[in-house]
């Protein structure tokens, strides 16, 4: 089998919005952009991956089409480890983070999709299997910056069966209102989005001590200040989580060696795909750190995260951005039911996208 074509596909999925309009980077967030990676082979097996996009989707699409594809077309898609190694070594001078690594991540997910399809297995079984049929999802609320909106969204999420809540807020009055809304039985996590110095974060963590947060996520800027995070972790009453902005194994190793976090959060669309994500799980086990992936995605990135987590020895929480769509190319597979994700049972990632919907959403 040979790879014959690699295509980046950008889609825009509109959000279903109510009175509570979320914000991102200071502007209303009305939709989600996703960079899909479609890998075709000469035997008719097609794999689907996802590369981190956010505001830099143009650069990521260019990296896929002009940097990655020419180096990989014609290769055997089953040689995943060798393809990964060749790309990382051959492209080191483009940087160890950013669009090139995001492109490699999307390719890697697609190659694992192909491998599992050829084996006739859902990916998690190819990775070691699981005794579980579901994994708990946590409702990862978007940023609202408004106390009432946040409290209303928490009530809605709990009503849908979620048992774990995460905020993207950093104002104490909002966090405290959310803690009251959750009550003592619902774990509450807070993603702060890197707003503070280490000393400021220590002060805030102590101010929040009575809320008994499950974790405080990315409280410090810059996010790669590992020694600063370690100092915060030693002083904070709440556990510290970080890692979504790390894009290579070595940097994750440095994070854990520094003793910076209790929860490590690799992102499969940034770290190098399934191949590198599995290494981070092993690294976490070696350091006694819990790995809980960053997965605010709605396609192959989310599905790949579910499969890797399903194959882990212990139960892993799955992040699900708490928002709704009128339609999505990946249908019901990306929607939790009663607060749980069903582990996909079809070969590969378990769900190929609806190409008609892709055609309507394509940018």
How should each PLM-predicted stretch be described?
Residues 167, 172-297, 336:
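Catalytic core of soluble alpha/beta enzymes
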Residues 6, 40-118:
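Metal- or metallocofactor-binding catalytic centers and their adjacent structured scaffolds
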Residues 74, 121, 238, 289, ...:
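Short glycine/serine/threonine/alanine-rich loop segments
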Residues 2-4, 8-17, 29-34, 275, ...:
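Flexible C-terminal active-site loop/helix
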Residues 3, 44, 68, 107, ...:
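Conserved, mostly hydrophobic/aromatic
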Residues 135-149, 192-197, 241:
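Active-site mouth loops of central-metabolism enzymes
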Residues 94, 118-143, 178-179, 183-185, ...:
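N-terminal small/glycine-rich loop or linker at the start of catalytic domains
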Residues 1-46, 65, 81, 155, ...:
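Non-catalytic terminal accessory/regulatory regions of metabolic enzymes
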């Amino acid at each position: 089998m040979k790879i014959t074509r690699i295509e980046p596909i950008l889609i825009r999925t509109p959000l279903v919005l109510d009175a509570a309009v979320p914000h991102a980077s200071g502007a209303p967030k009305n939709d989600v952009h996703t960079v899909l990676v479609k890998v075709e082979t000469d035997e008719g097996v097609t794999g689907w991956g996802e590369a981190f996009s956010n505001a830099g989707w143009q650069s990521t699409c260019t990296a896929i089409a002009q940097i990655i594809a020419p180096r990989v077309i014609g290769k055997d898609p089953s040689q995943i480890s060798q393809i990964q190694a060749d790309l990382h070594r051959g492209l080191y001078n483009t940087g160890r983070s950013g669009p090139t690594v995001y492109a490699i991540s999307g390719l890697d997910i697609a190659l694992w999709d192909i491998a599992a399809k050829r084996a006739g297995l859902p990916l998690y079984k190819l990775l070691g299997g699981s005794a579980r049929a579901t994994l708990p999802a946590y409702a990862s609320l978007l940023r609202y910056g408004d106390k009432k909106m946040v409290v209303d969204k928490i009530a809605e999420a709990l009503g849908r069966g979620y048992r774990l809540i995460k905020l993207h807020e950093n104002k104490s009055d909002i966090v405290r209102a959310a803690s009251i809304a959750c009550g003592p039985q619902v774990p509450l996590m807070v993603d702060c989005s890197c707003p503070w110095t280490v000393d400021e974060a220590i002060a805030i963590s102590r101010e929040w001590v009575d809320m008994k947060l499950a974790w405080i996520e990315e409280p410090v800027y810059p996010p790669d200040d590992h020694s600063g995070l370690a100092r915060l972790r030693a002083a904070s009453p709440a556990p510290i989580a970080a890692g979504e902005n790390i894009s290579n194994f070595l940097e994750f190793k440095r994070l854990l060696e520094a003793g910076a976090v209790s929860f490590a959060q690799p992102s499969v669309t940034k770290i190098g795909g399934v191949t590198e994500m599995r290494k981070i799980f092993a690294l976490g086990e070696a350091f006694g750190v819990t790995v809980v992936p960053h997965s605010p995605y709605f396609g192959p990135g989310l599905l790949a995260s579910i499969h890797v987590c399903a194959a882990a020895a212990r139960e892993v929480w799955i992040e699900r951005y708490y928002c709704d769509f009128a339609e999505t190319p990946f249908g019901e597979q990306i929607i939790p039911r009663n607060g749980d994700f069903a582990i996909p049972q079809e070969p590969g990632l378990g769900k190929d996208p609806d190409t008609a919907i892709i055609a309507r959403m394509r940018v």
